Amino acid sequence: MNAPLPIIDGVSPSSHRLPAGHWETILEFLKERFPDVDTAIWLSRMAKGELVDEMGLRLNSGSAYRVGACIFYYRELESEASIPFDERVLYQDEHILVADKPHFLPVIPAGRFLHETLLVRLKKKWKLEQLVPVHRLDRETAGVVLFSVNAATRGHYTALFRNRKVRKVYEALAPALSKISFPVTRRSCIVRGEPFFRMKEIDGAPNSETRIDAGEKAEASMGGARLYRLNPLTGRKHQLRLHMSGLGIPIMNGGLYPELSLALAVDSEDPFSSPLKLLAKSISFEDPLNGREYYFQSSRTL
């Protein structure tokens, strides 16, 4: 479905399908569904014509609730902190765009991040209304991200990841470990943990796999850490962090594994002082449309 509202400053309208329920008006639903959004904000959006249905019809405080209807609106943030690091575009053609993401920058809007996201920055700068990430990196991870530029060919590139046709290489800094002979392959069953933003490994059929090799020792200032090369064969959330932690070599500045660490809480005076030492160094694949072998590498280092 095409959105009936335009993209503004790189921000696409959000949408919400109306479920079955007891509400008489759309405003009643919005007030209950989004209790943290003040009613005055919804009324303001309505007055500006920035809350519409799937046909582009403006909604108001008395608009009747329709099960199955789709409403569109723009997310707004009262304030949004600037992220003082720039992305780089490594490649672009009529089908794909490849970006080199800095640490701390989310890929897509969520929570307290809207304009300061890789997607919105790129859409605004390059005027690419159909731009969509084909895969994701965590906000804390830097490195290579592949985007689809053309909706008509997007499925070819999402299929590459779904069918594990993309070769991914990560680099990580973690403690040196002499009792393991590298390279080693870690397989485990990863499920959602507690709190909700953590994952955990449990006994069960493996649903994740990573090949890990050890490289040279890092500079002395890194406290004897070692550089590791990680090749994930699957893409579970926090997979690399969990697998490294499970081997007894948690990635530096992780803060989530093996335990939730308050000691690594972000410094309020400098929230960017301790980036996670994890970098999506490269991706490579055979282009599904022209058969060319592509290799894209981040210029960033840990």
Model-derived regions: residue spans:
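RNA pseudouridine synthases
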Residues: 1-302
